């Protein structure tokens, strides 16, 4: 694996000079191997090690290199034809392979090759970009998008129209992460490497970026780039120091543990926020 990483790191340093016409065989095969390993879930761009999320930057570099070394090509789909550098994940799947891998894909959901989809996942008409990791039991609902290299945990619900930001455009240092057992409400956006920690509930229409204030109304604490585990979050505003205006923020209205979440439905958690 170290040799593979070395090839990617070296090629990335000279990426500006690499084209589909001049890329060497070693680099092409290394990138192809990494994309295949990401696609199968054997490797992932970020993983939790000793309680901390670690981003493997060289894997992200391999994803970026894949766009340098591949030409656009015609891609046939059921509803249309496409013209892109990255092939579709399910292009060669037959019924036996879908049955073996154990997830559902509802048309016209689209997944790029290099994204991992775990068992018991349901993809409604949605989009999952290259390098993303979607873990077991997760629902990606209609018109939700999972950005490049985003990490989605087990038993997550991404509601209709949710946007989970990627790392490629604009280039971000770390992927956006939704940990296990989270609920992300309809039309919410989580971007710029924000981490939503385990068991959190994000209400409809909440926007979270690195500069978004995440205000805990019980403690008065303000978080940036991280929603603490077990938080129930809604949209809100905080007043300016002079009181002349207010700016958007996200508000943590309560904290819940796994036991409470198991007994109380998501809708009930969001309705009882006074």
From Swiss-Prot:
EC number: 2.3.1.117
InterPro entries: DapD_Trfase_Hexpep_rpt_fam, Hexapep, Hexapep_transf_CS, THP_succinylTrfase_dom1, THP_succinylTrfase_N_sf, Trimer_LpxA-like_sf
PROSITE patterns hit by this protein: HEXAPEP_TRANSFERASES
Catalytic reaction equation(s): (S)-2,3,4,5-tetrahydrodipicolinate + succinyl-CoA + H2O = (S)-2-succinylamino-6-oxoheptanedioate + CoA
Compartment(s) of residence: Cytoplasm
Gene3D superfamilies named among the record's database cross-references: Hexapeptide repeat proteins, Tetrahydrodipicolinate-N-succinyltransferase, N-terminal domain
Binding annotation for substrate: 104, 141
Enzyme class: transferase
One GO BP: diaminopimelate biosynthetic process
GO cellular component term, pick one: cytoplasm
Top-level taxonomic group: Bacteria
GO terms of molecular function: 2,3,4,5-tetrahydropyridine-2,6-dicarboxylate N-succinyltransferase activity; nucleotidyltransferase activity
SUPFAM superfamilies given in the database record: Trimeric LpxA-like enzymes
Pathway where this protein functions: Amino-acid biosynthesis; L-lysine biosynthesis via DAP pathway; LL-2,6-diaminopimelate from (S)-tetrahydrodipicolinate (succinylase route): step 1/3
Record keywords: Acyltransferase, Amino-acid biosynthesis, Cytoplasm, Diaminopimelate biosynthesis, Lysine biosynthesis, Repeat, Transferase
Xref: PANTHER family: 2,3,4,5-TETRAHYDROPYRIDINE-2,6-DICARBOXYLATE N-SUCCINYLTRANSFERASE (PTHR19136:SF52), MOLYBDENUM COFACTOR GUANYLYLTRANSFERASE (PTHR19136)
NCBIfam families per UniProt: dapD (TIGR00965), PRK11830.1 (NF008808)
Self-association and partners: Homotrimer.
Family from the record: Belongs to the transferase hexapeptide repeat family.
Protein name: 2,3,4,5-tetrahydropyridine-2,6-dicarboxylate N-succinyltransferase
Protein encoded by which gene: dapD
């Amino acid at each position: 694996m170290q040799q593979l990483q070395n090839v990617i790191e070296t090629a990335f340093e000279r990426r500006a000079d690499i084209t589909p016409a001049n890329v060497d065989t070693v680099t092409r095969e290394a990138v192809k191997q990494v994309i295949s390993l990401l696609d199968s879930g054997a490797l992932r761009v970020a993983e939790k090690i000793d309680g901390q999320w670690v981003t493997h930057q060289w894997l992200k570099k391999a994803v970026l290199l894949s766009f340098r070394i591949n030409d656009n090509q015609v891609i046939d789909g059921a509803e249309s034809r496409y013209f892109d550098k990255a092939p579709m994940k399910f292009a060669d799947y037959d019924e036996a392979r879908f049955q073996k891998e154990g997830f559902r894909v509802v048309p016209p959901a689209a997944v790029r090759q290099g994204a991992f989809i775990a068992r018991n996942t349901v993809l409604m008409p949605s989009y999952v970009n290259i390098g993303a990791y979607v873990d077991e039991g997760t629902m990606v609902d209609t018109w939700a998008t999972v950005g490049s290299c985003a990490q989605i945990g087990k038993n997550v619900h991404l509601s209709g129209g949710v946007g989970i930001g990627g790392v490629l455009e604009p280039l971000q240092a770390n992927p956006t992460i939704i940990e296990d057992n989270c609920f992300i409400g309809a039309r919410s956006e989580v971007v710029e490497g924000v981490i939503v920690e385990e068991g959190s509930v994000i209400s409809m229409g909440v926007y979270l970026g690195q500069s978004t204030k995440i205000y805990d109304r019980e403690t008065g604490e303000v978080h940036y780039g991280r929603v603490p585990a077990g938080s129930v979050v809604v949209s809100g505003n905080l007043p300016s120091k002079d009181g002349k205006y207010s700016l958007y923020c996200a508000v943590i209205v309560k904290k819940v543990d796994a036991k409470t979440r198991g007994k109380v439905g998501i809708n009930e958690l969001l309705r009882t926020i006074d």
